[in-house]
Amino acid sequence: MSFVMAYPEMLAAAADTLQSIGATTVASNAAAAAPTTGVVPPAADEVSALTAAHFAAHAAMYQSVSARAAAIHDQFVATLASSASSYAATEVANAAAAS
């Protein structure tokens, strides 16, 4: 008796949904990159310039972290899709062996 139940079609559907979520997130981050990394100082004083530079640095760091997170997300989606295919192939092989 198996204690693990895997439904390949559900894994594949989850991979598709996660792929869509990842693409939307990447697009949103790309759209936010220019306005957040190019913060214009509100005034011509030194404090405003330093504050704007500080915000721009944080935005650049966010973009870097987001790119790494997107890469990890893509690897996870690929692994999930591959697992769905593997489970489906195993089910077919087990059904053929049982016949």
Swiss-Prot record:
It comes from the Bacteria. One of its GO terms (cellular component) is extracellular region. Residues 1-93 form the PE domain. Induction: Expression is positively regulated by Rv0485. Induced by different stress conditions such as surface stress, oxidative stress and acidic pH stress. Keywords: Cell wall, Secreted, Virulence. Pfam families: PE. SUPFAM superfamilies: PE/PPE dimer-like. It is found in: Secreted, Cell wall. Its main location: secreted. Belongs to the mycobacterial PE family. May play a pivotal role in the interaction between M.tuberculosis and host. Can enhance the survival within macrophages under stress conditions such as H(2)O(2), SDS and low pH. Increases the production of IL-6 and IL-1beta from macrophages, and decreases the secretion of suppressor of cytokine signaling 3 (SOCS-3). These changes probably involve the p38-ERK-NF-kappa-B signaling pathway. Also precipitates the macrophage death. This is PE family protein PE13. It comes from Mycobacterium tuberculosis (strain ATCC 25618 / H37Rv). The gene is PE13.
